[in-house]
């Protein structure tokens, strides 16, 4: 692990990292997020009775779209040609929450961690948006990188 911030130059200014000379390698990242809610809200999602429609399908598409738009949201992220984005949603009624996991892949010169984190985060935000009419105190938490593969820094697993 590096002991310096790669997005800060010698003058202390933020800059986009130059990846011109880096080798193209297979890159993969997995992330997760959770959204806690009342049992009744989760039941609405699970049994399909939510008045806005299929919450999981909408959140999945939002997460995929968010991964593709990460460089528009995070100023110093490189625009990437993603080859795979997967967003999975799992109701966990025993914990009154939904677990969101994302997977992003590409062959490229820079990693896809931010894309995976953005996918999981925006999927959680979409669930909040769709359910806020019935519950405003839902909690989005534990957004984290689960695993990354490829590149100079190698393999990371939480």
UniProtKB/Swiss-Prot annotation:
Complexes and interactors: Homohexamer; trimer of dimers.
Gene Ontology BP terms: Mo-molybdopterin cofactor biosynthetic process
SUPFAM superfamilies: Molybdenum cofactor biosynthesis protein C, MoaC
EC numbers for this chain: 4.6.1.17
Main function: Catalyzes the conversion of (8S)-3',8-cyclo-7,8-dihydroguanosine 5'-triphosphate to cyclic pyranopterin monophosphate (cPMP).
Reactions accelerated catalytically: (8S)-3',8-cyclo-7,8-dihydroguanosine 5'-triphosphate = cyclic pyranopterin phosphate + diphosphate
Pathway entry: Cofactor biosynthesis; molybdopterin biosynthesis
One Pfam family of this chain: MoaC
Disulphide bonds in the chain: none
Keywords of this entry: Lyase, Molybdenum cofactor biosynthesis
CDD domains per UniProt: MoaC_PE
GO molecular function terms attached to this record: cyclic pyranopterin monophosphate synthase activity; GTP 3',8'-cyclase activity
HAMAP family in UniProt: MoaC_B
InterPro entries found in the cross-reference section: MoaC, MoaC_bact/euk, MoaC_sf, MoCo_biosynth_MoaA/MoaC, Mopterin_CF_biosynth-C_dom
Keyword Lyase on entry: yes
Name the record gives this protein: Cyclic pyranopterin monophosphate synthase
Gene3D superfamilies: Molybdopterin cofactor biosynthesis C (MoaC) domain (3.30.70.640)
Protein family: Belongs to the MoaC family.
Active site per database record: 129
């Amino acid at each position: 692990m590096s002991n310096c911030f790669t997005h800060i130059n010698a003058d202390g200014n933020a800059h986009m990292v130059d990846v011109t000379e880096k080798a193209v390698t297979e890159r993969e990242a997995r992330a997760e997020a959770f959204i806690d809610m009342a049992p009744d809200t989760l039941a609405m999602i699970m049994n399909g009775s939510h008045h806005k429609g299929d919450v999981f399908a909408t959140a999945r598409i939002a997460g995929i779209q968010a991964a593709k738009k990460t460089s528009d949201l995070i100023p110093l992220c490189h625009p990437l040609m993603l080859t795979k984005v997967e967003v999975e949603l799992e109701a966990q009624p025993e914990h009154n929450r939904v677990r969101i996991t994302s997977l992003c892949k590409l062959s490229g010169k820079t990693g896809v961690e931010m894309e995976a984190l953005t996918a999981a985060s925006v999927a959680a935000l979409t669930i909040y948006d769709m359910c806020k009419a019935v519950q405003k105190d839902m909690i989005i938490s534990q957004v984290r990188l689960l695993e990354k593969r490829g590149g100079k820094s190698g393999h990371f697993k939480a």
